[in-house]
């Protein structure tokens, strides 16, 4: 965090991390769903000498960034931040995937960097390598460069949760495909991962109603074994596969 940074924090809790961020950043906007905390926190921050923290009482899934026209149309809350803002979050496990998708895929204005604490299993999926890929892996690695930072054992929390957590950083990057080609990417990926135990050629053949031999040929063109499963392909191979399918099916 640099002195010129504006930070969006999701779920400040009692504000300990919020104040640490505010010591380094130009400003911090904290989104808090709990009405009691949202009422208490502004007074707490001012009493501690912080005048660069704004608390927004709202559900993060009902907030948009720099989209006032969408906010008005959809009755959402709009938050105005610089285009290079950074996001820090201790994400509730129940909304992790939905929340990550909103900020990665641009349903709200995308941050330049995300640092999130998530369930350890989710952190491993975000940063997975070929052989263990998933739809969430593709999402994170298409829109960002994710890095597994550190484990946070359950024993570090009170009350102690049932699972361990981990910290992941996601440096966002410009998508490499056009909007139309992205539709192809997610269509192929959804079909490909529809049955993880089946070979990818079987899933794509059945889902797209094309010959299995044709799919095998397409997989060979992206340097992949024809008996592979969806989780075996890297993000770059999925992107290449989009071009191969488009060239042969349009």
Indicate where each model-derived feature is located:
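Catalytic cores of RNA-modifying enzymes
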Residues: 1-184, 188, 231
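Peripheral terminal appendages
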Residues: 2-6, 14-17, 208-250
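Detector for Asparagine
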Residues: 52, 66, 78, 90, ...
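An accessory alpha-helical subdomain
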Residues: 166, 170-172, 177-214, 225, ...
């Amino acid at each position: 965090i640099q002195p010129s940074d504006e930070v969006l924090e999701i779920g400040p809790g009692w504000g300990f991390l919020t104040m640490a961020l505010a010591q380094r950043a130009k400003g911090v906007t904290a989104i808090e769903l709990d009405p009691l905390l949202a009422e208490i926190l502004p007074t707490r921050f001012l009493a501690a000498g912080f005048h660069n923290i704004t608390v927004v009482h709202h559900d993060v899934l009902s907030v948009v960034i720099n989209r006032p026209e969408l906010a008005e149309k959809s009755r959402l809350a709009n938050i105005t931040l610089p285009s290079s803002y950074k996001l820090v979050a201790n994400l509730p496990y129940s909304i992790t995937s939905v929340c990550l998708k909103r900020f990665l895929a641009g349903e709200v204005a995308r941050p330049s960097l995300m640092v999130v604490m998530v369930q350890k299993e989710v952190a491993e999926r975000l940063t997975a390598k070929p052989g263990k890929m998933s739809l969430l892996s593709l999402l994170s690695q298409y829109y960002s460069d994710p890095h597994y930072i550190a484990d946070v054992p359950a024993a570090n929390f009170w009350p102690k949760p049932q699972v361990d957590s981990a910290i992941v950083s996601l440096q966002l990057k410009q998508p490499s495909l056009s909007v139309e080609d992205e539709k192809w990417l997610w269509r192929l990926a959804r079909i490909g991962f529809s049955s993880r135990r089946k070979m990818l050629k079987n899933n794509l053949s059945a889902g797209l109603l094309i010959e299995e031999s044709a799919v095998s040929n397409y997989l060979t063109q992206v340097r992949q074994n024809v008996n592979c499963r969806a989780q075996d392909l890297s993000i770059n191979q999925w992107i290449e596969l989009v071009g191969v399918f488009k060239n042969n099916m349009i």
